[in-house]
């Protein structure tokens, strides 16, 4: 049987189809769990603000204490779990006993270490609060320590949850870990609901340091910890179904953690450096709350770390749903290209990820920026002044939110090459920036500190992209920059149009007047969001089509594939008919292209050449797709020359399409672009000509790249 027939049989076999359907259902189930968990997380945050108030010293104190368990776990043990334990669990799961003996010993060791760590940290709660806060008075310090004692036991359950999640994932059970956080949020929401029912909302009954009691602490901090406990306990149900026979086992010599720790040492250092810098920034973020607690009644509102926390959750949401998911899928493609030493394939995967994710990330940034006012009012517990504080902070963060996803996608390239050292250098530079910036920020007026920290995050996002791009150029030669800029410019045009449309809608709701309808109450703010957001999205998608942003199709294809399945008589993809003047591609090329269309990460779409601002900056180009000239005659095997012989009137530069003027000379913009993006080995070379043969048959490229 020929290779082409084998490929067709593999693609169309019932087993393959059933496997793809099963994977699709599992992926949809996990995505649904993640989305529901995110939604409930924002419901929990909204209830917390409704119960305690956004500009409340109690809220700032609780947010700081409730963040400590997660920060301590990530600082001390999070890097160990990700860099050391996960590879060992995956390796052990392939053993004849499915890793039962090894995992039992590992879980016994992890439980003992995490329990000891949690006990020590909880006993040292007063010292930890002093180290992570600044300017707290006696009453606020006492409440902070109380909150910490209730919240710090979460460290143990975070560690156990992380370990159980990896054991389940290693055995193919992915959904439980995605759905368990939903129960966590429901428990916390239940506690906050009881709080509002018993003690009233902050709007009608302000809760202060003076009138706070033990029952209130239990309903807020106690239920927060209870949610984490229930979340972890639920994972024992699917774990029991695996029938691994796990039990306490001692004796850890020869387990192999030492060798794994050496491999993951750079990843561990990256985690430690980033978390230490973050802890210091959070310490500075507590200053405004301390100043507000000691300020006389009637003082102007000051944004505290609760404002920064809510704004950070909102700005991180698009990245966590879109970019993380896409990067997870693309990482396999990057890893294969790295293993094959395929620089071109690695560059194509990165370019595909940066362009495809940007379709959603650019809109998300524009939406957060334009809708910052109603979002702030919705989370303000009915206080317009507090809503304005959140709106300003969110606007600052939204400006550079795409850079967060860009840098994350870039670092996947390093990890695919098993290079954890370069991300450490990037994180080290960011840590230095955060430490120096936070040290300077503490001397600003209290009302400006949170805004300055948000600005510091934005500067860090930009710096991380620049540093990562610098190191990536040494690996990839160039980053497919013109094509990426081409797509980003088009998306930017669509984003501007969407922003103007949303601005008009918000103007109708009175967003730009202090007495406007939007600022009357939270219901008015929510109504304006529900009207403006769909209008902005519709305008954005329409303009993406107008500007021929092909990446929209690549982003939507895997999403629509979950709901739209071809009938038995339909083909998954249909190759367009070739013009009569162009030879038809061989059948194996059509089959290969059809197979690539089924994989959302495999396609490298053609990019239209007209951006308006930067005409003909780049064309869609990869080793399998070349643009043929309109008139050419074959000269030899697979090569061609312009009719009439001689040189082409429009020279070809390097291996990208280049903007040229009508007389064939390159513009200053093109010269600058080539100097900025192209490495010395790929600078324009006069006299080279574009390959004029059929797609995928360029003899100047190795067969494995065609």
Where are these regions (language model features)?
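Membrane-embedded alpha-helical bundles of multi-pass transporters/translocases
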Residues: 1-593, 597-598, 602, 612-617, ...
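Long, low-complexity, intrinsically disordered segments
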Residues: 610-706
